[in-house]
C-alpha cells in the first residue's frame, strides 16, 4: 500500500523559503545554486522545496496556480513554543495569518503563511 513519504512545495524564492522554514525550527540544509532541497522531519516525512525552474524542467507546461491546494500543520512542544515561533517568524518579516489563540478544541493554535502563501499552522495541546 502506498504511504505518504514527502510533501513538495514549489518555491518562487528558495532562499526566503529556506529562511522561513529554518525559523520554524526545521533543519533545512544549504543548497547553493541548486533548485531542490529536502529535509526529513522528526515524523519521517520529508518536506521538499523545488524552484519553479526545476518543476518546468520536467513539466514545461507547469504554471503556478492560485489559491492553496495544501496546508502544513507543525506540532510544537508547548503553547509557549507556538507563541514564540509565531512571534519569531512575524518579527523576521513573514506573514502572520492569525495570531496565537486558545482554540475550543483544546490546542494553542496560530497560522502563518510561507513565502509562497502556503498556510502553515502551529499548534500544541493546552
Region roles according to the model:
Residues 17-21, 89, 117:
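Conserved active-site tyrosine of GNAT-family acetyltransferases
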Residues 13-27:
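Amphipathic alpha-helical segments
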Residues 9-12, 77:
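Residue-level signal for the nucleotide or nucleotide-sugar donor/cofactor binding architecture
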Residues 11-13, 104-105:
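Conserved beta-strand-loop-alpha-helix junction that forms the acyl-donor binding cleft
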Residues 8, 15, 83:
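Conserved catalytic core of two-component sensor histidine kinases
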Residues 1-5, 27-113, 124-126:
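Vicinal oxygen chelate
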